């Protein structure tokens, strides 16, 4: 499960969701793709993302993200919010499953040498605006947030190449 902040019926909720977006309209959840990334450039067009983009945006808390053996974090090591989409699938028996994915964009100059995409990072202070469902004008106002975060307040550290043999060794990768 992934921790996500969402707004529903005017109230913000923190909840655990399954990673990989399962659209609410899917008939058979076992046969449906469950993307973990949604490209910012196509979220308004693709059927899987169109509804969540309009009504179900979420925030995913993070202290860093990984790309090709590197950890990218804020220089001050503070938490930040990744832009996400969520949806609720309701089964024939009434059971509910909430799922989410992260929105990606082109990379900034720090991430570009590592990968051609990076997560969308919501600018500090704009979290509530991101969560607010809205009409076309509101969504168009969100589009500037879908661009790469500036490289300056970020830091990129190479991780040790060896994979951990057990859970206790994982922390040593960051030494």
Where are these regions (language model features)?
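A structured binding-face within diverse protein domains that lines the active/interaction site
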Residues: 1-175
């Amino acid at each position: 499960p992934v921790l996500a902040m969402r707004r529903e019926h005017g109230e913000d909720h923190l909840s655990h969701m399954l990673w990989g977006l399962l659209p609410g309209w899917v008939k058979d959840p076992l046969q449906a793709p469950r993307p973990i990334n949604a490209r910012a450039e196509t979220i308004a067009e693709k059927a899987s993302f169109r509804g969540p983009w309009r009504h179900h945006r979420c925030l995913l808390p993070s202290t860093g993200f990984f790309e090709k053996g590197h950890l990218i974090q804020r220089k001050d090591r503070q938490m930040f919010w990744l832009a996400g989409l969520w949806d609720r699938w309701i089964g024939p028996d009434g059971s509910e499953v909430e799922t989410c994915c992260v929105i990606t964009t082109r990379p900034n100059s720090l991430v570009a040498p590592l990968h051609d995409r990076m997560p969308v990072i919501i600018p500090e202070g704009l979290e509530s605006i991101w969560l607010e469902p809205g009409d076309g004008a509101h969504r168009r106002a969100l589009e500037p947030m879908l661009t790469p975060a500036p490289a300056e307040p970020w830091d990129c550290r190479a991780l040790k190449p060896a994979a951990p043999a057990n859970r206790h060794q994982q922390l040593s990768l960051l030494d």
